[in-house]
Amino acid sequence: AIHLKGVKNGSKVLEIKCPDWKKFGRPKSGRGNGQTLLGMPRFDNGQFTSRFPFAEIVLQDQDIPIDIRITGWSPFIPTDADNSGLPVGALEYTFTNTSDEAVEAVFYYGANNNFMSANHKTAAASILPTATGFILTQEAVPDGREPWVEGHFAIFTGDPATVVNHCWFRSVWFDPLTFAWRDISEGKLTSNPPSNDAKAASLAVPLKLGRGESKTVKVHLAWYVPSSGNHIGGDARNDRDRGPCYDPADYEGIPYYYKPWYASRFEGINDVIAYWRAHYDDLRKKSELFAEAFHASTLPPEVTEAVAANLSILKSPTVMRQHDGRLWCWEGNNDSSGSCHGTCTHVWNYVQALPHLFPDMERTLRETEFMVDQDSRGHQTFRANLPIRPVEHGFHAACDGQFGGIVKAYRDWRISGDTEWIKRLYPLIKSSIDYCIRTWDPKEKGVIEE
């Protein structure tokens, strides 16, 4: 939100006005829509544009003599999978004074501790301090059960003038929001210390802008959720299922539940914060370089937009990277869950962006297909387990996915030039081809007919 001192109607949420159908067409809207903030004052006009991996919103309002540009992004640097998979994001708020006089304002950014769960009364939830910001956190359950309840989300700026309110007014119903909005509408810089029972926090950045002057406030976001409750798929039932590459030593000590790759790279949220602070400018520069090159294409804008829209899937929860760096993917996502597990080969068979932008990640999919999900017959199970481990082979193979894996192995070798890699896979590729011929072309006509 923004507050302009001495300006009538000068306090507004940094969003455009909500359409009436969103305010009044929802269940329980007659009671004020709870904590949605849909009734708060917002900007009259807004425009959204996308230059993947950057999104931009421009806000304007007749009451506010400031133009506001919000730029959202997270690192996306082709061939650099590690930095492109960081658990971070950024919102850059640029304020430009369009009046003939100097203006004073305060920028606010607040959040509830959404990690706090009433169902886990033994998990300690709190809001912790970090330089020029705060950390929403919930610790793991002491007995080690349900590790997925642990989570940490940091919100901070790079502005030393930032004032942090670590603890909103503690009450029920709408009281916390009421008091928070009172502070905003009065331009207060409230600085409450951390408290163990805090449920929401905010930061405030005072601004002084001369005529025509601009200033950018960079809100850094970082998170760390080291475990999950995801253990998916049926395990191999016998040596045939486990296949020729199986070595029990490869699976000693692997986590029972999915553990994200970044939790192996970073010790905790403070490590992520430190890395994001130290490398912010460089990661932005490299991401901007990709955006400039991509959007400078002479392809029709409709094509560029379509490709960019699909590239965004690589930055979504559809694509997961487990503790050892290998990719595992859903077919897509629901609002709060994955849809159809296992990097399904007859869905992911048609992906083209990943092998060309992040070829090392694409090759991990070939390794899973041939070295983990292929049994001693050459049969491939087209859905991989999570965490990745030998899978049962009680269902039919998917011919498009299995044929496609063979073709893609050749493509991936052409892209990478890694001959040792293709040599390691070749016996398994040959076994897969033999299985395909026996199963779908038993008369050896070169045509799928079974």
Model region roles, listed by residue range:
Residues 66, 95-99, 103, 211-213, ...:
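Ser/Thr/Pro-rich, low-complexity mucin-like regions
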Residues 70, 75-182, 186, 203, ...:
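Polysaccharide-binding surfaces and accessory modules of carbohydrate-active proteins
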Residues 24-88, 169-203:
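Extended, loop-rich substrate-binding clefts of extracytoplasmic carbohydrate-active enzymes
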